[in-house]
Amino acid sequence: CNKWWMEDILKTSDFASEQKDIKDLGNNRVYFLPYLMGERSPINDPSARAVFFGMSMDTTREQMTQAVFEGVAFALRDSVEAAKALGINIVKSGVCGGGAKSPMWRTILANVLNITLEQTENEEGPAFGGAILAAVACGEYPDVKSACDKLVKSVKKTEPTPELAKLYNDRYSEFSKIYPSLKVVYSDISKNRD
């Protein structure tokens, strides 16, 4: 979503410039449901589509950009909450790739998820993860943890802050009400789209 917003909608590749005027993290009243291709886990609704919510005549480009970043983070939080419901408590996560280079994106994500993020040295997460799993399968390492301990290097750590995590927790509660309110609408529109 972040790349789509920047490149396809704003027609820029200068991500840093677009982020420099975003200043009031945790207080944006514009929401974005990032369901550009439906939504997978944990909602599993192929008819869901992206929506901006809460815009007014005063809404700025910066608020919309911030809403896109926050919406992606809130959608990831949906998956973290699903894991919690299964008894899995996630306290830290690695981040990599283009988005991980942005201090603002890491700050939003760390505080929305309320976990420590470690930016990894290797930017090719999926391919590198596949190589790690292959190394374990071939017997080079006894388990995934051992392989990761040896191969994955952290270059930056981003910690949540209590104040910002609280603001984002409140915003996540509001975000969580939007999709259920639109579920029937998504379904009806999907029937007419097919």
Regions found by a protein language model. Name each.
Residues 1-194:
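Active-site core segments that coordinate phosphate-bearing ligands/cofactors
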